[in-house]
Amino acid sequence: VIPQMDPVFVTCDFVKGTIDMAYHAQEWELNPENIMHGGIISTALDTSMGFLAHYYTHLSAPTVVTVTMNVTFLKPVLAGDIFHIKCQLDSLGRTLATVKAEVRLERDDILAGIATATFMAVNE
């Protein structure tokens, strides 16, 4: 499903521990309420936060897996909205990385959601 979501890399700052990825809300991602399905938003969050976690843990292990993820939805994402997943590395240990993220709509810079996740570096 991730290729169909067509994520766009916007920025990454290794020193600050941040990444920004953009997504375009598409018709197929809407739920019966005609807003973006929370599971699709969660997939975008997991993908973006996991990408950042992998960036910092890839030297210790080739794979990173999601251990926990907590998402809070604040505002709806509508069809056609462009939204950014802005991630920040919160902590980094030997095998665990914790990342926090915001879902921000381009229209009026609306905060649509927040999330935190912990990822584990594994050697498969």
Q: Language-model segments: what does each one mean?
A:
Residues F51-H84:
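Hydrophobic beta-strand-centered segment that forms part of the acyl-chain substrate-binding groove
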Residues D20-L52:
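Hot-dog-fold acyl-thioester-processing enzymes
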Residues V77-A79, H84, Q88-E124:
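HotDog/MaoC-like acyl-thioester-processing domains
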Residues Y23-A25, F73, A121:
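Hydrophobic residues in beta-strands and at strand termini
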Residues G39, T43, T47, T68-F73, ...:
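Hydrophobic alpha-helical segments of small multi-pass membrane proteins
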Residues M5, V15-I19, T63-M69, D81-F83, ...:
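A generic structural signal for short beta-strands and their flanking turns/coil linkers
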Residues V1-W28:
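Non-catalytic linker/capping segments at the edges of enzyme domains
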